[in-house]
């Protein structure tokens, strides 16, 4: 299927590693021009090189999105270089384990900035360009908002906010023809996930026990699979889909 993404300029926050990297590589294969916004230039450039080696195009902007001023600067840099924005994938963040019992005000607020505030700011500053292009927005979110996990209050709250923003923006932006959807992630073996699993007793046994609970194939979702769904939601092939929380999790 041709997703009609050729030459589309798509911002992908946190696009250098993990799920974001998977999304960027799929978009590159589809002929889009993903633009990574991420804090580590070395990681950004490595993913840019991988996309280009596969015959695609890719760009990058270095930004620390926990800084509220960084989102506007990053979006301006994209517009200055490419002249437009056709889509946004909000993906950057991390399950940072700020719980109810072990957390505090400062850590909780810092986690919300790391995991939710820049979702709002990136889209806020991209909106004029998205109006022109009638672009699409995809928010990457986590099952923790719906299931809980324990010991990660801030991350769960941020993902609840991501889900709420998805539906709120879908309503607010209807008049501009801008669609907004979310891809809800459960288990995907990213570098961050690997670091987390290694903190547990008997990590390999724990990993196998987690995989055993996943109904479809008893395996984790791949970053490429998440990228495929994200690309579809950005495409006009999903032209009548908005305000949806799409669970890509093997059941």
Predicted regions and their residues:
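Active-site helix of classical SDR
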Residues: 123, 158, 166
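C-terminal substrate-recognition "lid" of short-chain dehydrogenase/reductases
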Residues: 4, 120, 129, 219-248
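Residue(s) in the substrate-gating loop at a strand-loop-helix junction
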Residues: 142
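Short, small/polar-rich loop/turn modules that mediate ligand/substrate recognition or access, typified
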Residues: 174, 179, 241-243
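Conserved glycine-rich cofactor-binding loop
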Residues: 16-18, 40
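Substrate-binding pocket helix/loop in short-chain dehydrogenase/reductase
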Residues: 99-112, 210-211
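Catalytic Tyr-x(3-8)-Lys segment
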Residues: 203-225
């Amino acid at each position: 299927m041709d997703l009609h993404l050729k030459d589309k300029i798509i911002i992908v926050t946190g696009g250098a590693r993990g799920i974001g990297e998977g999304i960027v590589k799929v978009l590159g294969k589809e002929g889009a021009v993903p633009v990574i916004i991420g804090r580590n230039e070395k990681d950004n450039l490595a993913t840019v090189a991988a996309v280009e080696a596969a015959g695609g195009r890719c760009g990058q902007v270095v930004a620390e999105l926990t800084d509220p001023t960084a989102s506007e600067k990053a979006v301006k840099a994209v517009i200055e270089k490419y002249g437009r924005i056709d889509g946004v994938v909000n993906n950057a963040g991390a399950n940072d384990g700020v719980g109810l019992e072990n957390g505090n005000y400062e850590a909780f607020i810092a986690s919300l900035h790391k995991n939710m505030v820049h979702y709002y700011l990136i889209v806020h500053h991209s909106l004029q360009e998205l109006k022109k292009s009638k672009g699409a927005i995809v928010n990457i979110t986590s099952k923790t908002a719906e299931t809980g996990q324990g010991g990660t209050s801030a991350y769960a709250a941020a993902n609840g906010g991501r889900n709420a923003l998805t539906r709120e923006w879908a309503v607010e932006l209807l008049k501009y023809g801008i669609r907004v959807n979310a891809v809800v992630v459960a288990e995907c073996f990213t570098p961050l996930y690997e670091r987390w699993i290694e903190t547990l007793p008997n990590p390999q046994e724990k990993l196998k026990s987690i995989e055993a609970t996943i109904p479809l194939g008893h395996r984790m979702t791949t970053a490429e699979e998440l990228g495929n769904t994200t690309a579809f939601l950005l495409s006009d092939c999903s032209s009548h889909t908005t305000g949806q929380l799409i669970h890509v999790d093997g059941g």
